[in-house]
Amino acid sequence: MKITNVEMVISAVKQEQYPAGQLPEFALAGRSNVGKSSFINKMINRKNFARTSSKPGKTQTLNFYRINDAFYFVDVPGYGFAKVSKTEREAWGKMIETYFTTREQLKAALLIVDLRHPPTKDDVMMYEFLKHYNIPTLVIATKADKIPRGKWQQHAKVAKETLRLISDDELIIFSAETGQGKDEAWGALQKWM
């Protein structure tokens, strides 16, 4: 996909702050520091558009990025980060649940997992949450450049089995370093646009 125009529209905490209009939205969910911002940057060919951080738990808002005035990537705060308080975790849970369960513009979730390791309990819970609410899900197994190509399928199989991936949902092996899986990801998103 040719990207002509990207704009960070709003960092939202409450429903009233979500952008108006009917453009399709794709929400990126995943553990803190799994590479959601790097995924966005690679997909839109920008170096540091979605700010990446080496501090886990940095994104505490829903960040809406408008792409080509055609759709949004919504960067969801990462989960599974121990250093936030119980109150913050509950507020996070409420914010995420509200977005995923009420937002009509949400077309699909992109669950970002680390291909190097089996999905965590939090990843499994997130996937089950998405399936409970019948949200179409594309699993992006990132950091593929960090393991030998010959082991990709083996790692992908573990990820699919751990998540108990249903046949409607696809897993794409991805690398923000090399661009591996980028065209495949655009192809998969296209069907919801």
Curated annotation (Swiss-Prot):
This is Probable GTP-binding protein EngB. NCBIfam families: GTPase_YsxC. Gene3D superfamilies: P-loop containing nucleotide triphosphate hydrolases. Belongs to the TRAFAC class TrmE-Era-EngA-EngB-Septin-like GTPase superfamily. EngB GTPase family. Keywords: Cell cycle, Cell division, GTP-binding, Magnesium, Metal-binding, Nucleotide-binding, Septation. Residues 22-193 form the EngB-type G domain. GTP binds at residues 30-37, 57-61, 75-78, 142-145, 174-176.
